[in-house]
From Swiss-Prot:
It is found in: Golgi apparatus; Cytoplasm. Residues 124-147, 251-271, 410-521, 563-788 form a coiled coil. Interacts with WPP1/MAF1 and WPP2/MAF2. Keywords: Coiled coil, Cytoplasm, Golgi apparatus. This is WPP domain-associated protein. The lineage of its organism: Eukaryota, Viridiplantae, Streptophyta, Embryophyta, Tracheophyta. Its main location: Golgi.
Amino acid sequence: MEEEVVKSENGSLEFHDDTLSSSLQVNGVLKENENPDVDFLEDLDSYWEDINDRLTISRVVSDSIIRGMVTAIESDAAEKIAQKDLELSKIRETLLLYHVGSEENESSESRLIHDELTQGSSSSLKKKARKQLLMLVEELTNLREYIHINGSGATVDDSLGLDSSPHETRSKTVDKMLDSLKSILETVLKRKNDMELPSSWQQEHDFQKEIESAVVTSVLRSLKDEYEQRLLDQKAEFGGNRSLILGNIKEITGLRQELEAIRKSFLDHENGDEAGEVGDRKRVEQLHRKMSGSLNSVSSVWENGKHEESSTGLIPEHNETLRHMSPDEMINHFKIEMNKMKRDHDYKIQELTEQCFTFKRKYLNLTERGSFSFVGKDKELGALKKKIPFVISKLDKILMEDEKFVSEGKNDAGLKRQLDSLLLENRQLKDSLSDAAEKMSQLSQAEADHQELIRKLETDVEDSRNEASIYEDVYGCFVTEFVGQIKCTKQETDLEHSMLREAYELLLEDLARKEARKSKEDFEDSCVKSVMMEECCSVIYKEAVKEAHKKIVELNLHVTEKEGTLRSEMVDKERLKEEIHRLGCLVKEKENLVQTAENNLATERKKIEVVSQQINDLQSQVERQETEIQDKIEALSVVSARELEKVKGYETKISSLREELELARESLKEMKDEKRKTEEKLSETKAEKETLKKQLVSLDLVVPPQLIKGFDILEGLIAEKTQKTNSRLKNMQSQLSDLSHQINEVKGKASTYKQRLEKKCCDLKKAEAEVDLLGDEVETLLDLLEKIYIALDHYSPILKHYPGIIEILRLVRRELSGESKRPSG
């Protein structure tokens, strides 16, 4: 019996020791497990904070880059507009210098009124188009909101058989707005073509003025040539036979009458009623008809091209593709189309300029064949009109003096002096006419060039303004759409967050209930154990009393020991309850931490998706820009080859023209030498004639008529030779002036082509710099992705319990593997 008691005592003691050791082991494990969880969560928090900081930095950098690009584009546009405004102001000032206030007619006033009306109508059309665009944007935003709100309940409506009438009505309204925009664009094109018509009318009016002045100058030249020839004939016949003086007087009177008729014809010629120049006018009118027909044909082709482009650009299939495009793709698409339109426009402008140059060449050829040149302005014509009566008065004086000479027969020297003065005046008039013609041609060319520059600058300004307005409208549309998408995503994330919160609250309640049940069952088991132990002790006590009354003291001691053990067990149970409560609190805290970690992971997942989308967009932009740059390089290479060929052709032309100039100069020198020799011979013959006359007078001999006739024949031959040499010199001067004009034109074309090449090279350099910047951004973002992937891959065994993060890791791995393969391929 003693041994059993000892065993029981030993067993109880051993049980007590086991419980203590188990409790100590549990506490140690908990303490050991608490530290790594906390460290892991702290590492995750620090890692996510680093990622957040890097993402914020990348966002700030991308926003700053985008703002810089936008400001750069705006500054470039503003600089271009300012440059064009300055050029317009300079050109207008130069035109004001050449403009004469007395030439304003009723036609110019009507043209100004027409221009004001067209400007007012164009401004009203622009306002209408702006209103229609704003209405379209509002309708599109309403449609998107309607689709987004009713997207979740669309299946329910379809299952119930409900109609989608509001969607159809809104789509119909959008179609109506598009049709109205089409009609507005067509009206704008018609108004533009109507504005182009007065410019052609003005050109015809200018050509008519130039032709009238050319005809007047041709008539004056022909009359002056006849007058000079008659004067020379009179001079040749004057020294031989004094009996012919009366005939010369009659011819001078005839010349006076012709000059009066010319003066009268000047007055009639201002109204355009001249009968002698019908053939020349017919030729010029035919040339004007050809030019106007070509301009109208080109304008009709331009209109047809614009209508075709507008009709093809507004196909419904194309509209569907535009609806499915993203904002960046839409912007790139519109930029490509605008570049194409600019290229077509520049090509057509080049064709028109070439046609204008061809017509000008034909016109110059006609002027050279018809031997009429341009006269100065109305002031110079007025000066000529004033000189004609002065010449008539001088002719009257000559007639009076000739009559006196016939009556007296002694004033030969005075007549010769007057004839010389008249010849000098005629030469001065010729020089003034030639100078006036040159000035008129220069002024007409300058005016034509300035008008072309003004038209080009106005078209460029209108294009830039239209582009700016389109950019503003498109940017507004995309901003509104982007804000709506952000609001929708925010609502969806709020709903998901509320659903997750409710689910986690339910899970926590279930866990708390389960833990309470477990603690109650453990307490009941401990109570049952204690009751069983008490019953065993009572049985043993009774048996010990029956067997031996001697061991009562030992049993009492044993009972006291048992009571102490029971008390210690109760204390241990209370301590265990406290530990269980503390563990429950720790579990709740860990669940809260897990929930926050999941939320942070979800947000970071979204951020990583956004970053990956941005990287994909940047890669697509880089690829597109590379393709565009390659296309531009190819086009520039083709254009440069063409321009180099043209430059080579111009250089060959210049060399040939220089050779012709040298030949012409040599011929001029030869002609001058011949003229000088003939003048010397004439002076010698005159001196010999005078000496012979003096000798004859001194000898008082009768001169035979044969000698007089021989002298007259010599004088006629000498006069003919001088006339021929003068005509040849004039022809050479005209050829030299034409060659100099051609050389100047070729030089101007070469300079313009060089400027175009330099501009295109600068544009290519800018595009390459932008591509380099985008490549650097892509590389930095890829480096950031690699760092994120390495950090997440380090915690891959822990993150296996989160499938969303594993999917993100797979996507990142694919992106990185694709980027590593691309440069190798």
